[in-house]
């Protein structure tokens, strides 16, 4: 099952990657888990900046400052508590709420494939060769990971053609096939690079022009193959001579670069393409030496562990297959040139013993162009060409095939095998239409099939081996069990078999017909005037009947169709379309694969129906076939003949009787020989099928154990990752707690220091102001106080401005720093989360596949058991159900009667009881309501009187207290002012006297200095005017900058709020999309499971139908054989 098929790309290299450890965290995110809100200090200062700038006292002088600050932080915490979002920490916790508990310990498995397979025997045919892929792998700049590769890989033309096989990987199951590297695309060189061939050339192997390598052709003499047919009575032989293409001498050779995927790909660049047999005659061995890649393939460095080797192989294989599909296109398999064959008239008297018989099968559809040649047979003693004069034998492959399929061929051939004539030597020649004659044939395919026939002793007639015996006598190694990856491969094997196996059957049947025809010619040379004309007329009639019957029939295909060939046909359809699916659309790939499997089932049924010949003649017609009695002479005619004519006729009839007796004897021997060969072939087929089943079972068990090793390793990795994640979350929580504790202590310390500083400044301000008030007089008290208030307000605003700028700078620095840390933490958590989700998904997929296989196995076992139990249980339950129904009906009637009586009595009692309770409840409610109204009126009047008296008393006491305090302070102040005024008056008088004397002395000096000062004053006045103008300009600029600053602050606040809102929306959208994706994935997996069950059921039904058709055909063949035997007996008797 191709689940992903590319779906199991697990990057184990991420386990080796070190994860960053963060020792610092944002103070804002520690106090508030939501990362999208501004720090509280910024909001607090923004709120404070909105207050009035003309306060009379500092804000710390307010005794409610501390309480308001604490209340602000509490309200901010409560207000942000409802808007908290899930952090990366909480997201990891939610992902790993229920980790998978594993009882085993985390142990290091350096080589899981070898340790898991150590309990099983490994055959030489099971995955011993290394997988060879030519991949240019670029190395990353930051992380040297082998999990991703570039799509622009440099591949040579030879490497592109050698890498069409899919690898064996943990996520996909596939069959391998023999490599088709010989089918090169030569369509580009048809016009200018094609060789000039002669019109008629000597027969022999015709090879395609190779554009990749220069292959020397072998000696034609060594490739000439002939088959000798002898007779039992004479020493003569029939020589059928042909030529064959060279075949790899090794039985296990598939000439394929395909091998198992268990070994590392480090050997791929060195070994390149090489045949497994190392034979000098193998065409792949010669061609592989000439192919040179356009770019050198770098060798991969050694990975730290075998798991990385396995994943690296997988990635290389997947990328390589995609690159090959992109380079090959859609018309690679359709542009193969047809092998041209020419008719050569030659004669060779040599008699060589050869073992191989080959035939080139042309699949061109133009039948008129094919029927141009004829098969010529030349006897030794007579130069006449009997076959050419009388149209004795069919000359075309289609006619020969139709002739071999006739129902009466065996009867005629058995009567013609007479060995009493001199030896006859003939040659079998081929006549096939050249490839250049028909333009349509240039886009079709031509295959070459090879069959081996063991040599027979001299002097005895040897029968050509049929395709059934060839298939039964094939060794198990020829099935390429070491190349089998799994049971659902999609290759071209079915198409290959459908084109070549009918060719083998046609070849064998044509060989039998040719042998029979040659023997008939040898036996009838002396008696051509009597028997020869009758035989020729019978053969002509049979040919005409067969042409009418089999005109609409196609080429018959094999009836023994298996599951892997149908799957390969489906893959051929997908490859010819040339569509390379992306690695992301795995679900669509799986559905397309299932559709191809179902279409292959339907196509197989249709081909089987078409391949079954629908004979127009029934068995009854064969039995009741009328005898030819028109030529039997009458008795009166015989009596009128002379004696010498009667004697001559008696001699002819005696010779005819001898011929028929010899034919009957040879037919019996042939029947015995066929029976023995059939029994031997059946036994060999059973033994080979059992051996193949054992080997396949062994191979599949090894594949399952290897996949189980992968799954166990992934589970161990998941367990270690879960432990690391848990440790990381614990460490983050401890760091969170430490930072929160530190933040609380720092806040408390700063609060205490600010409160102490404000208290000291307030006391200093109070002392300075009291001192100034004492120095002032009563008259200038109000003006001085207003001045002091203005100065204090100006100082307060300057301090606020400086403090605000300092705080904003510090907060901006902290914000940038914390945002950087936050983004780095978020990125690392997102990467870890993606890696964990990917590994979880792969582990779930693997576990689902294993559970699906187990359920399929247990379903078949439980089905039979459950059906039996269900039948028994159904009978027992039906009997019990009838008894219970009868009892239940009786009980039900009694219960209904009792229930009706009890219900009427209960209704009556309940009505009485409800009436009494309602009256009692109404009385009680009325009394309670009246009592409540009276109590409430009394309490209301008392409470109003009490509150009024208490309020009046409090107001009087407060009014009297503040009046007395005001009078006392005013008296003290007046007394203090009067004493200060007297003292200041005395001091002023003394000071005035001293200064008067001093000023009189200085007046003279001042007048002299006055002139110079006036000049300086004029200059200073000009400078002052300039300074005033500059001050006004500066003030205007300051106002403009303040307006711009307020506008910028407002815009910044709006932008921050918009950013927070967008983050919230994006997070909500991501969560909703994740939920939708999870639901869609679950639905797809359910649909996929149902579809897989339907496909498997469809395949089982197809196999059953094909088995039924095969059995019906076998029965029909037996019946036809019985009819033919009966006809032989009747004919011999007559």
From Swiss-Prot:
Chief place where the protein resides: cytoplasm
Coiled-coil intervals: 732-1131
Comp. bias regions, Basic and acidic residues: 180-196, 494-504
Deletion phenotype: Displays reduced climbing ability and die very soon after eclosion. Loss of protein expression leads to truncated sensory cilia formation and impaired intraflagellar transport processes. Simultaneous knockout of Cby and dila results in lack of motor coordination and absence of cilia in chordotonal neurons where centrioles fail to build a transition zone and Cep290 and Mks1 are mis-localized.
GO cellular component: centriolar satellite; centriole; ciliary basal body; ciliary cap; ciliary transition zone; cytoplasm; pericentriolar material
Keywords, comma-separated and alphabetical: Cell projection, Cilium biogenesis/degradation, Coiled coil, Cytoplasm, Cytoskeleton, Differentiation
Similarity section: Belongs to the CEP131 family.
Protein name: Centrosomal protein of 131 kDa
